[in-house]
């Protein structure tokens, strides 16, 4: 559980929001700080992309799917594992979806 702006925000044991509707960009900053990440414009690009992906496909992308979808939209420079791991060192799919307020991707350990 997180306390944010005086409200209790329910999370699972790994810190993923139980209700993605409670997400906001200001809450994302707090979640990112808990992950040891200071959000740059590049981080926001991925976080927003992951949220859009979830809204379109009703699932959080696992790493392979994330890399492929990022490459299709932004090109090979940003759609590759090295770039994404530089931004999200504990796992791009796991950390980006957590910061985006989405459920943990199914294929993430």
Curated annotation (Swiss-Prot):
Record-level GO BP terms: tRNA wobble position uridine thiolation
Family label: Belongs to the DsrC/TusE family.
InterPro entries recorded: DsrC-like_C, DsrC-like_dom_sf, DsrC-like_N, DsrC/TusE
Record protein name field: Sulfurtransferase TusE
Protein's UniProt keywords contain tRNA processing: yes
Role played: Part of a sulfur-relay system required for 2-thiolation of 5-methylaminomethyl-2-thiouridine (mnm(5)s(2)U) at tRNA wobble positions. Could accept sulfur from TusD.
Enzyme Commission number(s) of this protein: 2.8.1.-
Superkingdom of origin: Bacteria
GO molecular function terms noted in the UniProt entry: sulfur carrier activity; transferase activity
Keyword Cytoplasm attributed: yes
Places the protein is found: Cytoplasm
Gene (name only): tusE
Active site location: 108 (cysteine persulfide intermediate)
Annotated source species: Shigella dysenteriae serotype 1 (strain Sd197)
